[in-house]
């Protein structure tokens, strides 16, 4: 029975990985520029996105596996859950976590930078004339990658050794053996804890800036983007109007052929107006082609069809996401206040909370649903995808910046390969920030013990197992502060919570920054949410030719019935003959 249960948990994780592969592919193909698509960049971005999402979605697997060793209804360990069995489960999870974190680090520090420099090294003219070989590109990318890696490792070593060097100097033990002991201590787990804490802290800063803003903008953007005229109809109407426009231009030019004075004032004004209208129609034609997925990958075309199906639900979905965002906001605020007020050790250990003292809605929902796997897995998957989507929206809105300088812009169908790689690295770091936030703030009880309980009944001897079958009121949720010795035998904390607690205890600075950053996240969300409700974003004048579709789509809006008809046309790919505008235009120029 135990083997079946654990196998089903891992099967659910495998199914989630397959879903994540589709999501990662949609994200990459939807945002990258089709004309500049490079196979190496596409594969690296998809695989890196898949790895980072797989890392954060290991949390419910972690919770389900450690919780499967106990009976929450009785607060006892199951008969098969011997210490060796439990240790085996924990050890397996540790190996998977180390593998995924190492893979994320390998991708961010070596693979993605190498791919970035490989793409930058390409010289089209030199390649056409045979002056640049693949070996030269590889060597150039390799040199820059090594330089980047040396820079990162140097920062890591300085950050890791300087505090301990000061401590060793104070203790008059400044020798090489002391530093060897630091690296060998707990098989290097302290060094790994520092590396994880450093990356998690950097990721949390990005999480505050990008995800905090994106979580506020995502629902509002869905609400404000009302259903518009279908892409097939837009293409048909535009083609008809463009043909009529050019025919009228030919008539004007033909009428004035051979005339000495050229066009008269009235015809000249009309021709200039037609030329301006032609440019607008050409932009609109390009918009229709891009929106319908013309010349795009089949994944993008499929996604456009799916969007068309759910387009009528955008308003409802946006309102629902606002409710979800506000519940997350309230849950994080409650946990933050609880930790600040009731932490067992305060800033000395990163504000670890022994047990929840204030009712927290999101944590309660996940704990209750975790009793019936995989309900909690589905809810957690949706929660992670919401954070991920919010991060993407935040990056797409703000762009990739250094201080006030915009280095890259992230736009659907217009993102360069270099920008895609940079965005992927940012998302990887942000997911590490999401890891901390979900496990320690959003749902701390769920991410630590899940639905595990223990029997708080006194026994005559240490070896005797307490029985609460007749005392249900003594069955209590597992907690780090439980004083009953039986709690230590029954309660098994998740591997991730152990990792994070190890980081915050060994390196309190990381714990303080990670904790107070959650309040900064809430502040950014609140400011952007209120601002977004009352202020419409301005269009970048430098990208009018590319972004004009928003104004044009709004100008083509019609009745509600027409909007739902547009949805059906997008699904089928067929359009009606006219919408009236074409008829009037044809009649005007006939």
UniProtKB/Swiss-Prot annotation:
Q: Which Pfam families match?
A: LMBR1
Q: Which InterPro entries match?
A: LMBD1_LysCbl_Transport, LMBR1-like_membr_prot
Record carries keyword Glycoprotein: yes
What's a BP term from Gene Ontology annotated to this protein?
protein localization to vacuole
Key word Transmembrane helix present: yes
Per the record, GO CC terms?
Answer: vacuolar membrane
GO MF annotation list: cobalamin binding
Q: Which UniProt keywords apply?
A: Cobalamin, Cobalt, Glycoprotein, Lysosome, Membrane, Transmembrane, Transmembrane helix, Transport
What is the superkingdom listed in this entry's lineage? Eukaryota
Positions of glycan attachment? 565
> Which cell locations does it reside in?
Lysosome membrane
Topology relative to the membrane, per the entry?
Answer: Multi-pass membrane protein
Q: Which residues cross the membrane?
A: 9-29, 41-61, 95-115, 145-165, 191-211, 315-335, 347-367, 378-398, 422-442, 509-529
Q: Which family does it belong to?
A: Belongs to the LIMR family. LMBRD1 subfamily.
Q: What does this protein do?
A: Probable lysosomal cobalamin transporter. Required to export cobalamin from lysosomes allowing its conversion to cofactors.
Q: What is this protein called?
A: Probable lysosomal cobalamin transporter
* Species this protein is from: Phaeosphaeria nodorum (strain SN15 / ATCC MYA-4574 / FGSC 10173)
At the highest ranks, the source species' classification is: Eukaryota, Fungi, Dikarya, Ascomycota, Pezizomycotina
């Amino acid at each position: 029975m135990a083997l079946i249960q654990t196998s089903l948990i891992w099967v659910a994780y495998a199914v989630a990985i397959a879903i994540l592969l589709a999501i990662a592919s949609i994200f990459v193909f939807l945002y990258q520029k089709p004309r500049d698509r490079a196979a190496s960049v596409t594969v690296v971005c998809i695989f890196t996105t898949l790895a980072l999402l797989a890392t954060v979605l290991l949390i419910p697997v972690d919770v389900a596996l450690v919780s499967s060793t106990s009976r929450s209804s009785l607060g006892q360990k199951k008969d098969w859950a011997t210490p060796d069995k439990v240790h085996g489960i924990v050890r397996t999870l540790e190996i998977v976590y180390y593998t995924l974190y190492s893979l994320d680090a390998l991708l961010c520090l070596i693979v993605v930078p190498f791919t970035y420099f490989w793409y930058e090294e390409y010289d089209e003219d030199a390649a056409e004339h045979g002056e640049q070989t693949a070996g030269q590109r590889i060597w150039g990318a390799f040199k820059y990658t090594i330089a980047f890696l040396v820079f990162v490792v140097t920062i890591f070593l300085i950050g890791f050794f300087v505090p301990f060097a000061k401590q060793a100097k104070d203790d008059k033990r400044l020798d090489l053996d002391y530093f060897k002991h630091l690296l060998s201590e707990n098989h290097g787990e302290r060094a790994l804890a520092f590396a994880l804490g450093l990356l998690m802290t950097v990721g949390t800063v990005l999480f505050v800036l990008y995800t905090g803003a994106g979580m506020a903008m995502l629902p509002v953007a869905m609400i404000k983007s009302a259903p518009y005229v279908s892409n097939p109809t837009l293409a048909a109407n535009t083609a008809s109007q463009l043909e009529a426009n050019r025919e009228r231009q030919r008539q004007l030019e033909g009428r004035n052929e051979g005339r000495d004075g050229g066009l008269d004032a009235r015809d000249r004004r009309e021709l200039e107006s037609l030329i301006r209208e032609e440019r607008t129609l050409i932009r609109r034609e390009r918009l229709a082609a891009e929106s319908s997925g013309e010349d795009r990958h089949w994944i993008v075309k499929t996604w456009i069809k799916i969007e068309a199906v759910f387009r009528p639900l955008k308003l409802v979905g946006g309102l629902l996401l606002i409710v979800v965002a506000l519940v997350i906001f309230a849950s994080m605020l409650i946990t933050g206040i609880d930790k600040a007020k009731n932490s067992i050790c305060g800033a000395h250990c990163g504000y670890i909370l022994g047990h929840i003292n204030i009712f927290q809605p999101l944590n309660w929902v996940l704990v209750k649903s975790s009793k019936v796997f995989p309900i909690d897995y589905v809810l957690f998957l949706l929660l992670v995808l919401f954070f991920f989507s919010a991060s993407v929206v935040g990056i797409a809105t703000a762009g990739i910046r250094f201080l006030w300088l915009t280095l890259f812009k992230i736009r659907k169908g217009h993102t360069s390969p270099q920008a895609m790689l940079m965005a992927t690295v940012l998302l990887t770091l942000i997911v590490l920030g999401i890891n901390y936030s979900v496990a320690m703030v959003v749902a701390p009880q769920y991410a630590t013990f899940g639905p595990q309980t223990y029997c708080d009944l006194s026994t005559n001897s240490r070896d005797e197992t307490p029985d609460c079958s007749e005392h249900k009121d003594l069955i209590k949720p597992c907690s780090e502060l439980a004083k009953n010795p039986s709690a230590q035998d029954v309660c098994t904390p998740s591997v991730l919570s152990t990792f994070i607690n190890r980081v915050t205890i060994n390196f309190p600075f990381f714990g303080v920054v990670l904790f107070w950053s959650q309040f900064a996240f809430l502040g950014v969300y609140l400011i952007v949410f209120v601002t977004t409700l009352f202020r419409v974003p301005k269009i970048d004048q430098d990208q009018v030719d590319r972004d004009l579709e928003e104004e044009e789509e709004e100008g083509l809006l019609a009745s509600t019935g027409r909007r739902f008809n547009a949805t059906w046309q997008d699904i089928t790919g067929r359009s009606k003959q006219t919408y009236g505008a074409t008829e009037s235009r044809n009649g005007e120029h006939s």
